[in-house]
Amino acid sequence: MSALKNYGLISIDSALHFPRSNQLQSYKRRNAKWVSPIAAVVPNFHLPMRSLEDKNRTNTDDIRSLRVITAIKTPYLPDGRFDLQAYDDLVNTQIENGAEGVIVGGTTGEGQLMSWDEHIMLIGHTVNCFGGRIKVIGNTGSNSTREAIHATEQGFAMGMHGALHINPYYGKTSIEGMNAHFQTVLHMGPTIIYNVPGRTCQDIPPQVIFKLSQNPNMAGVKECVGNNRVEEYTEKGIVVWSGNDDQCHDSRWDHGATGVISVTSNLVPGLMRKLMFEGRNSALNAKLLPLMDWLFQEPNPIGVNTALAQLGVARPVFRLPYVPLPLSKRIEFVKLVKEIGREHFVGDRDVQVLDDDDFILIGRY
């Protein structure tokens, strides 16, 4: 009870022992404002659960320098759980072919279909197995600021090198609310802001990015609006990664982008590295454009999921609502692989045309 008294609370028992008062005193008690003798809310009660130990933390500049970041696919077992063996093979292949970072649980990795327990576990697994060889950037963004805070705290506690944050979608907010949302997570560690209005239905305008860029933890922007926006930022010294694979060559070499956060690099990581590192290469870009068009004919990650299954590096298991591309498109993919060269693609099996019956669609997992 002594602890309760410190917060200005009165027990029911003690209330029974108040002396009987006259009518005026009773009236005053009913209408008086209750004032706590000690503030009930400790001022720093909601500080983030962050460690003050910085010796193993990634410097924001280490994130800003990355040119090829793969939005890594999450493969599944037939019962819908993560296939960690296949996942590890995918990440190892990225490392061997020169990718410098992976986005864990992004749109491509289907973070939107994961529980937060699954999501944070996969970030921790990736850090534990590969954190010394590749930068691990966890997609800990959410349209709920509360969830974004909690997930980002846990992700950095797991050892991720950076966070990817999207603006609040569906329940859209004001410009001021958008800025406030990002400010709550920026102080936790290196952060990439993700602008993809095609999915969120709300653009992050330059005025927000310019304000956020004053925070030293803002590593840069994954920008999907287009190259004019990319150049608007790079001219002011803001680091930008193209979020559009079909524009990333020109973004890099004509508009100042640092690199790309790529879906296509799940399939051809070596060629995507070449596209970002070895100077302007219009011939290679033209060679890859048909593959990129094929990948995004339906919303991502449908195309990459289908392709990795046909290449034999991931089981043909889809978490609904995603379903594979139709048979005619699967036949097209086999032709694309042969035109580009099987040796450039991940895995070592022959590319196959899978039948509809080969795919497993999971609704409960």
From Swiss-Prot:
Keyword Electron transport attributed: no
Major place of residence: plastid
Annotated keywords: Allosteric enzyme, Amino-acid biosynthesis, Chloroplast, Diaminopimelate biosynthesis, Lyase, Lysine biosynthesis, Plastid, Schiff base, Transit peptide
GO molecular function, one term: 4-hydroxy-tetrahydrodipicolinate synthase activity
Domain of life of the organism encoding this protein: Eukaryota
Transmembrane segments: none
CDD domains, per database record: DHDPS
Cellular component, GO annotation: chloroplast
SUPFAM superfamilies assigned: Aldolase
Places the protein is found: Plastid, Chloroplast
Pathway linked to the protein: Amino-acid biosynthesis; L-lysine biosynthesis via DAP pathway; (S)-tetrahydrodipicolinate from L-aspartate: step 3/4
SMART domains for the chain: DHDPS
Annotated site residues (Part of a proton relay during catalysis) in this chain: 107, 170
Active-site feature positions: 194, 222
Single GO biological process annotation from the record: diaminopimelate biosynthetic process
Pfam families: DHDPS (PF00701)
The EC number(s) this enzyme carries: 4.3.3.7
Annotated pyruvate binding sites: 108, 261
Top-level enzyme category: lyase
Transit peptide per record: 1-39
Catalytic activity: L-aspartate 4-semialdehyde + pyruvate = (2S,4S)-4-hydroxy-2,3,4,5-tetrahydrodipicolinate + H2O + H(+)
Family classification: Belongs to the DapA family.
Function: Catalyzes the condensation of (S)-aspartate-beta-semialdehyde [(S)-ASA] and pyruvate to 4-hydroxy-tetrahydrodipicolinate (HTPA).
Protein name: 4-hydroxy-tetrahydrodipicolinate synthase 1, chloroplastic
Name of the gene this protein is made from: DHDPS1
